[in-house]
Amino acid sequence: KDGLARPGTARMLQWLERGIRLDPKHPGACHFYIHAVEAVHPERAVACAERLAALMPGAGHIVHMPAHIYIRVGRWADAIEINRHAVHADAQYFDGPHTPDAGFYSAAYRSHNHHFLTLAAVMA
């Protein structure tokens, strides 16, 4: 609310950055790093954003995550493209023959991908 990082944020960033140095392709570390830096220093997560979607191409939310960075740094075309892939990944999963109850994911995350796609398209 005041624009300041919460206590422990610097330490958390150290751990995430250490994890990324040890394994730059760790999808969890990149995912949480994007969330951790997107508001104030999105440029710090560009490298993670550029590799994350390919690490788990069938996981719509993970595929979408680079858009959090691309939108913040003005990479509108990349945000459009990545969200198209995220929407497709979700459709493949949820429209498949063994679809579980989508619950919260379908209500929130699937629409979130569409919202980001729309925002990027409007800004492009």
PLM feature segments, named:
Residues C30-Y33, V63-P66, Y109-R110, H114-L117:
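TPR repeat positional signature
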Residues R6, A39-V40, V73, A124:
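Structural motif corresponding to the intra-repeat A-B loop/turn of tetratricopeptide repeats
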Residues A36-V37, Y70, A121:
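Residue at a conserved register position within TPR or TPR-like alpha-solenoid repeats
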Residues Q92-A108:
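Acidic, Ser/Thr-rich low-complexity linear motifs
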Residues E17, R21, E50, A54, ...:
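Amphipathic alpha-helical segments of tetratricopeptide repeats
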Residues T9, P42-E43, W76:
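TPR-repeat structural position
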Residues K25-P27, A59, Y93, R110:
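Residue-level recognition of tetratricopeptide repeat
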